[in-house]
Amino acid sequence: GCLLLWLLPSILRALDSRPRSMLCQQSPTKVSCKGVGLQKFPKELGQGIKHLELSNNFIQNLSDSYMPGFGQLEYLDMCFNQLEAMSATTLAQLPRLQSFLLGSNHLDRNFLANGEAFRVLRNIQVLDLSGNNLESHMAGWYISNLTSLRVLDLSGNKITKLLAGTFQSTPGLRELDLSNNYVMEIQAGAFEPLQELEVVNLALNSIHCISGFSLTQLRVLNLSYNALELFTSEEGAEPYLLQVLDLSHNRLLYFPELPKVHDLTHLNLSNNLIASLLPGSHRLEDFVLPYKEMGRFNRTVRPTAALTHLADLDLSNNRLELFPFTFFHSLGSLHSLSLAKNCLREVARESFTNGTEPADPSPAPAEQTELSVRSLDLHSNALRVLPRWFFDSLPQLETTDLGSNSLQPCESQGSDQGRALGGGSHVPVPGDTCTPFYNVPRLRHLSLHENNITRLHPHAFNRTPLLSLDLSGNRDLSVPRGALGELELSLQKLSLRGNQMDESRAALPCLRALRVLDLAGNRLSLLPAGLSCSPLESLDVRNNSLQTLGKLVSRSHSLREVSLAGNPFSCCSLGWLDS
C-alpha cells in the first residue's frame, strides 16, 4: 500500500504528460478529437485519415505547420477553437480537402493573409465561416477564389451589405446561409453569378424591402425575422422554381404578390401585420418607408391565383378580422391552413368584384367553393359562430383547432333531425348563435378548449366520428349523458381538464374506444360511472376531490398510467393501490 502511494505522483505526472491526441477516438479513416484540450494541430495522428474532428479545442493557428500524413484528408472540423491565423504552406498540404468547418473562431483577425492562404483550397465544396465577426469585405475576400464551393455558411457575422461582386468567384454555389447578420442592403446583381443557387437563408437580418426578386432557380428562401414591408417578384416570363418561402416575423402589411411562383408548396406569413386579404387594399400611407415599387401593385388580381401547388399556408399572428373564404379558392392543393392568433370575428363566403367590394353573396356551385384543407387552425380569435356552409365547404377537413374563441355547439337530437337541421343547407339561419359540429363526416380531431362553453347539448357531434376531443378550459361546463352520443365507438382521447366540474356535470356515456382521459383540475369526488367500459390506458385526475379510485383501477386491465396528485385520498381506503 505504501509503495502505491509513493508511486502515485509519478503516475499522475505520466498521465499529464501524455499527448492530448491519445484522448482522441480513432478508426482507420476517421478521428474525433472533440473537446480534448488541444492547443495545436495533432500532427502525430496516423496516416490515411479522411475525416478529422477538432472542434471545441484551443488551437490558435495553422501557420507553417508540417502535417505529414494528411494528404488524404477530405473533412476537417475546427469549429469553436481560437483560430486566427493560417498559411498557404499549411493548407497546401491538404489537397483533397472538400469540407472545411471554421465556425466560431477569430478569422476577422489576419483576414488578408488568411484569405490569401485560402486560394490554395481549390477543391473546397463546403465552407463554414459562421460566427467569426466577419464584415462584408472580409467575407468576400475569403471566398474570392473558391470556384468549387457548393455550400457556404456565413451566419452569425457582421455583414451589413451584399456587394455586387461578392459571389463572382463562386458560380457553383447551391446553399448559402447569411442568417443572423446585419444585412440591410443587397446590391443589384449580387446574386446574379449564382445560377445554381437553390437554398438561401437570410433570416435574422434588417432587410426592409425585396423588390424585383429574380432568383428563378431558387427552391428554398428564408427571410424570417427581418423588417420586410414589401416583397415583390420580377415580372419576367420565366417561371420560378421556389417551393418554400418563409416571410414570418416581418412587417408585411399585405399578402405578397407572386404571379410566377407556380411551384410554391410552403408559405409562412405568420407574425406580420397583415390586416386584410382583400385585393386592392394597398395604401401608400400604411408603409413606414416609401417604396417606388408600390406603383406596380396589381389592384385587381388575386395574389393566390398562381399558387396552385401550395399545400401549407401559415397566416397566424397577424391582424385579420375577416376570413374571406373565396380568397383561398384557387389554392387547389392546400392541405394545412393556419389563421390562429388573429382578430377574426366572422367568415365570409362572398366573391369580390372591382377588387374591393363584396359582390352577390348567393351560394356558388359546390365544386368552386370547396377547399381541400385537411388541417385548419383558428385558435385564439374572436369567432362567435361558424355557419353550416363553412363545414360543408371543407369536405376533407380532418383536424381543426378552434380553441380560445366563443363558439357554442348546436343541439342535434339524433341523425335524422341533425341532417334536417342543416346537413345539406348552405345558408345559415339568420340570427344563428351556435355552431353545428354534427354531420362533419371526415373530422377526426377537434379542439374547443377555452370557448366559454357551459353546456353541451344532446348529440352535439352526431355523425362526426371524432377520435379526439378537447373541451378543456370551459369553466363550469356541463356534459349531460346524451351530449357525447354517437361517439361511443370512435372517441379515443378526451380532455375535460380545468372545467371545475363536479360529478353531476360529467355524465359520460359508455365510450368503448376511449384510451386517454384528462379530468385534471375539476371538483370530482367520484369518477363518471360510464368509464367502467372504457379500455383506458392513461388517466389524469390530478387536483380533484377524489378519495378513492376504487373499482375502476382494480378492474382495469388496460390502464398503464394514472396521475393522482392533489386529491384528498383517505389512508383507510387505499387498498386499490395494491391491485
Predicted feature locations:
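Membrane-proximal C-terminal cap and juxtamembrane stalk of leucine-rich repeat ectodomains
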Residues: 1-18, 23-31, 126, 134, ...
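LRR N-terminal entry segment and analogous cap-like coil->beta motifs
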Residues: 26-64, 70-73, 134, 284-287, ...
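Conserved LRR concave beta-strand detector
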Residues: 30, 51, 72-75, 85, ...
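Consensus "Asn ladder" position of solenoid repeat domains
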Residues: 36, 57, 78-81, 102-105, ...
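Leucine-rich repeat
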Residues: 39, 60, 84, 108, ...
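A structural signal for leucine-rich repeat
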Residues: 44, 65-70, 88-94, 112-121, ...
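Tandem repeat protein-protein interaction scaffolds
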Residues: 64, 68-74, 84, 98-101, ...
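Ankyrin-repeat and related helical/solenoid repeat scaffolds used for protein-protein interactions
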Residues: 515-575
